[in-house]
Amino acid sequence: MSAIVDVIAREILDSRGNPTVEADVLLESGVLGRAAVPSGASVGTREAVELRDEDAQRYFGKGVLKAVENVNTEISEAIMGLDAMDQAFIDRTLIDLDGSGNKSRLGANAILSVSLAVAKAAAEECGLPLYRYVGGAGSMSMPVPMMNVINGGAHANNNIDMQEFVIIPLGAQSFREALRCGAEVFHTLKGLLDKRGMHTAVGDEGGFAPDLPNNEAALQLIVEAIENAGYLPGPDVAIGLDCAASEFYRDGKYHLESDGLALDSTQFADYLATWIDKYPIISIEDGMSEHDWDGWKLLTSRLGKSVQLVGDDIFVTNASILKEGVSQGIANSILIKLNQIGTLTEALYAIESAKRAGYTAVVSHRSGETEDTTIADIAVASNALQIKTGSLSRSDRLAKYNQLLRIEEDLGDTASYPGRGAFYQLK
């Protein structure tokens, strides 16, 4: 009854108005699984490749009809009749069918849409929520949210170099409390910006995108907002950064245009260390460029015992690259973006590989999202303990938070919220 009898893909639009792929997988029992894939703005060079049409006459070349066609023909034919309960076998079938090594032939967007839709169909067939189907009985830990309240870099049209400034509710006793805390700080921050005549328009991920005197001004505003909302910076609400340093790394220097600085790796590590001494920063993502492995080693040696150092562009959710990073003492955490690797099985393997190495894993959205809430379930299923899925505005972001509220309600008294325990790699 769990045999796949039909696979249908279509072109839909993401939160930036760009095309993306949505797939339906129908089982013999009549059960349907549906999944839509996201798309990133700052993209690691070793990510799995999403397939775009490159037809300038349509969506400025960003159409995905080729990927849709690949699902409706080759992929559909390859998995028709297979058992949806065998996720690993189906994902391996998709990887082998593509044959390219980086999913560039069929498209990671095509492959991932089917991989996730299969899992959702199988969960429905079993009468289980997705988090329980994927994770089993041991999935009871809610993730600590990393909420993007100020956007910059490639995610906003402003003068801030750093891509994300996030708030992290550590002192809450439940996910519901953490979400309320984040919302209160978010609205307090909006009031501060408005009072000072700054823009309160939001960026791709729902955070505010004001022009500021320099990068540090964002940290000052966030600390003030935390305090004005009635919380303690640090114990109640910590701060995280996504530098997205690859975006401003050129010719061996980190170019911080809002500060008028061009820093080498040592100087940029010093720059970040100064912030850590002044502000309650517990996490830094992509603190060095993906092309600056020596800089990453320096940063990890300098800060890795006191701050979570998350590798996004450098690891691209790839367990093999993570293994290389672990062996060289690079970072202490990995960001998990499903479309960076292209199948559910590979993403879950990357999470497990990180845990075995003593690294944390942060399940993440992309800047171009849809209403699909799969990553909320995956964060709980994998006991990843952390999730990064945007700010407290834009329904494409809130959809994930609301799904986590439902999951916590479903878990009842068995649900746990780890707070600072989510950062178990820190001394």
Curated annotation (Swiss-Prot):
- Report which superkingdom the organism of origin falls in: Bacteria
* Positions with a binding annotation for Mg(2+): 242, 285, 312
Q: Does the keyword Magnesium apply?
A: yes
Q: In which pathway does it act?
A: Carbohydrate degradation; glycolysis; pyruvate from D-glyceraldehyde 3-phosphate: step 4/5
Q: What cellular component terms from Gene Ontology apply here? A: cell surface; extracellular region; phosphopyruvate hydratase complex
Q: Which GO terms describe its biological process?
A: glycolytic process
State which Enzyme Commission number(s) the record gives.
4.2.1.11
What is the active site of this protein? 205 (proton donor), 337 (proton acceptor)
Amino-acid positions noted as binding (2R)-2-phosphoglycerate in the UniProt annotation, renumbered to this chain: 163, 337, 366-367, 388
Principal location class: cytoplasm
From the Swiss-Prot or TrEMBL record, state where the protein is found: Cytoplasm; Secreted; Cell surface
SMART domains documented for this protein: Enolase_C, Enolase_N
> Pfam families annotated for this entry?
Enolase_C, Enolase_N
- Give the UniProt keywords, A-Z: Cytoplasm, Glycolysis, Lyase, Magnesium, Metal-binding, Secreted
Query: Which metal ions or organic cofactors does this protein require, according to UniProt?
Result: Mg(2+)
**What family is reported?**
Belongs to the enolase family.
State what this protein does.
Catalyzes the reversible conversion of 2-phosphoglycerate (2-PG) into phosphoenolpyruvate (PEP). It is essential for the degradation of carbohydrates via glycolysis.
What protein is this chain from?
Enolase
What lineage is on file?
Answer: Bacteria, Pseudomonadati, Pseudomonadota, Betaproteobacteria, Nitrosomonadales
Q: Which gene encodes it?
A: eno
